[in-house]
């Protein structure tokens, strides 16, 4: 089965929630993941979109969604949120995409040759910056 972070239903590969309103015990972190899962502009593995094919084995999201996800997790300020943030941005280094004006193929005539291209927003991958942990370390620990 897919890996879901303990205490959450939405953090990890896929989700374990039966409906949108359902959240795990780590509610705040789970809400960040749920919002990110519902990003309005994503590219599934091997999908061709915005003039680019996503050759990664996972979905990539528009950078606006990833930036919002990062801020959301950082505002939770607990260890679960940090673990999710570190896993996604620092360990897995999941890229996001931004749209830039460029030349994209609109008709490739079912061959490798592009027969018609035009100026359109074209996706460009952006590498993830490492996540900065936010949980306060307890004084007198470690």
From Swiss-Prot:
Major location category of this protein: secreted
The keyword Lipid metabolism is assigned to this record: yes
Tissue expression notes: Expressed by the venom gland.
Record keywords: Calcium, Disulfide bond, Hydrolase, Lipid degradation, Lipid metabolism, Metal-binding, Secreted
The record's free-text note on cofactor binding: Binds 1 Ca(2+) ion per subunit.
Disulphide-bridged cysteine pairs: 11-33, 32-72, 39-65
EC id: 3.1.1.4
Necessary cofactors: Ca(2+)
PROSITE patterns: PA2_HIS
GO biological process: arachidonate secretion; lipid catabolic process; phospholipid metabolic process
Protein name: Acidic phospholipase A2 PA4
Species: Heloderma suspectum (Gila monster)
């Amino acid at each position: 089965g897919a890996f879901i972070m303990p205490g959450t239903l939405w953090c990890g590969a896929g989700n374990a929630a039966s409906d949108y309103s359902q959240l795990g015990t780590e509610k705040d972190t789970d809400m960040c993941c749920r919002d990110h899962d519902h990003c309005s502009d994503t590219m599934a593995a091997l999908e061709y979109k915005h003039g680019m094919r996503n050759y990664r084995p996972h979905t990539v999201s528009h950078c606006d969604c990833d930036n919002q996800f990062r801020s959301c997790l950082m505002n939770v300020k607990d260890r679960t949120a940090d673990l999710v943030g570190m896993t996604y941005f620092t360990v897995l280094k999941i890229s996001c995409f931004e749209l830039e004006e460029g030349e994209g193929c609109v008709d490739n005539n079912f061959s490798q040759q592009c027969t018609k291209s035009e100026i359109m927003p074209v996706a460009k991958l952006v590498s993830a910056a490492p996540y900065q942990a936010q949980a306060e370390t307890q004084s007198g620990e470690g």
